[in-house]
Each structure stands twice: as structure tokens, then as C-alpha cells.
Design a protein with these regions (language model features):
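N-terminal intrinsically disordered/low-complexity leader segments
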Residues: 1-7, 185
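Short amphipathic alpha-helical elements of helix-turn-helix/winged-helix folds
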Residues: 16-20, 93
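Short loop-to-helix capping motifs
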Residues: 114-115
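An amphipathic alpha-helix adjacent to DNA-recognition modules
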Residues: 10-15, 27, 49-72, 76
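Hydrophobic/aromatic-rich alpha-helical bundle segments in the mid-to-C-terminal region
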Residues: 118-123, 127, 132-185
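Hydrophobic alpha-helical connector segments
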Residues: 58, 72-105
Length: 185
């Protein structure tokens, strides 16, 4: 099996696992269910992930990497002044790919309910990002409000609580972006 074909299969498996968690809940995440949803035999799934824990580790690692990499990419591609770049990228990444966010949230939920120690990598990456946000030239209080608002929005999206219509969500995002400009250090 070629590397790209192997990587494609892994993506299919991870997407299937995330879909099961999102649609049916953590308790329904079994190797059999993932294999079926991914269109593979259980042996085919086991070739890539030798156990349910290996699959969960793969989910957390893959989606954590993708999420934080998307933030870094936005910062790298930003041609404006350095003030607020990390905070702006955090806002943009958090709302630009809701499909990625849903998959990351599925991975984090599975880890939280099956083996919370698997969240350590995510926590480390989040702490690194938090350091960058707090040293971004934006008032630390505004950064904290922005971060907690995004985390709250993410929580709301994960659990389907108080969904915002498109207009309100866009106004919310605009308000967060305006807070970057307010009281810059």
C-alpha cells in the first residue's frame, strides 16, 4: 500500500470515527462500527490502528495537529502588522472550518470519556497558543474575553446549545475582531 493510499485510509477511518461520535455518541465508538462506516473490514482498520485506544490516540493527534496548524498557517500568511496576528488567526481558524472543529471536538470528547490523559498533547498545544495570544500586543483582558467567548461558542456548537443564526454569528465574529483593535498594548 502506498503512503498516500495509507494516509487516505487513515483519514477515512478518523472521519468515520468522528462521525460516529458526533451522530451516535461516545459509547457507540467501536472498532466494528468504525470499520463498517469507513467501508473497511475490521482487519483493514486494525492494519492502521491496532486497538480502540490507538484509534482514539490517532483521532486526538490528527485533529489537534490540524487545528493548531491551521492557526499557524493563517499567521504565516498574514501580511499585516504583527499586533493581534495570533488572536486574529485564532478567531478565523475557530470559525473557518466548523467541520474540522466538530471532528476535533469528537476526538476530545472520546479522549475525555475514555482516557483523559490523552488530552495532555492538546493541553500542551493550547498552552503554547495561549502564551502567543497573551503576548500578541492586544490587551490581555480582551484576549481572555475573546478566548473564553470562542471556547463558549465551541462548547455551544459541540452540544447544539443555543445555535446562532448566520447574521448573529457574523456579528459575534466581527465584535471579537474589533476587540483586537481596542486597547492594543
Amino acid at each position: 500500500m502506498s503512503i498516500s493510499n495509507s494516509e487516505d485510509k487513515k483519514k477515512i477511518i478518523l472521519n468515520a470515527a468522528a462521525d460516529i461520535v458526533k451522530e451516535e455518541g461516545v459509547a457507540k465508538l467501536t472498532l466494528e462500527a468504525v470499520a463498517k462506516k469507513a467501508g473497511l473490514s475490521k482487519g483493514g482498520l486494525l492494519y492502521h490502528y491496532s486497538s480502540k485506544e490507538a484509534l482514539i490516540i490517532g483521532m486526538v493527534q490528527d485533529w489537534t495537529y490540524r487545528y493548531f496548524k491551521s492557526i499557524e498557517t493563517i499567521v504565516e500568511n498574514n501580511t499585516k502588522s504583527g499586533v493581534g496576528n495570533w488572536t486574529s488567526a485564532y478567531i478565523k481558524a475557530s470559525f473557518s472550518d466548523l467541520n474540522l472543529d466538530k471532528r476535533l471536538s469528537s476526538a476530545l470528547l472520546v479522549a475525555m470519556f475514555t482516557n483523559p490523559s490523552l488530552l495532555e498533547e492538546y493541553k500542551k498545544e493550547y498552552d503554547i497558543l495561549l502564551g502567543k495570544l497573551m503576548n500578541d500586543g492586544v490587551d490581555p483582558i480582551n484576549v481572555t474575553i475573546i478566548r473564553l467567548a470562542i471556547d463558549g461558542m465551541w462548547f455551544s456548537e459541540i452540544f447544539g446549545l443555543g445555535s446562532l443564526d448566520t447574521n448573529l454569528k457574523n456579528n459575534f465574529i466581527n465584535k471579537l475582531n474589533n476587540m483586537i483593535k481596542e486597547h492594543s498594548c
